[in-house]
Amino acid sequence: MARYRCCRSQSRSRCRRRRRRCRRRRRRCCRRRRRVCCRRYTVRCRRRR
């Protein structure tokens, strides 16, 4: 079950349905919640704890 965490600019439901948008901001980490839109890059963002 892939859960896509989106940044404040994107909503959860939108990110889940539109994965193409995630690829665009795949390098963008949410500084507030330290989470990335795409789950692949969540590990990278989580490392910055």
Curated annotation (Swiss-Prot):
- Please state the span of the N-terminal signal peptide per the UniProt entry: none
From the Swiss-Prot or TrEMBL record, what is one GO molecular function term?
DNA binding
User: What tissue specificity is annotated for this entry?
Assistant: Testis.
PROSITE patterns, alphabetically?
PROTAMINE_P1
Keyword Nucleus attributed: yes
- GO BP term, pick one: chromosome condensation
Compartment(s): Nucleus; Chromosome
Give the superkingdom in one word. Answer: Eukaryota
Q: Keyword Transit peptide, does the record have it? A: no
What keywords appear on the UniProt entry?
Chromosome, Developmental protein, Differentiation, DNA condensation, DNA-binding, Nucleosome core, Nucleus, Spermatogenesis
Q: State the protein's purpose.
A: Protamines substitute for histones in the chromatin of sperm during the haploid phase of spermatogenesis. They compact sperm DNA into a highly condensed, stable and inactive complex.
**Protein family per UniProt:** Belongs to the protamine P1 family.
Q: What is this protein called?
A: Sperm protamine P1
Organism listed in the record: Pteropus hypomelanus (Island flying fox)
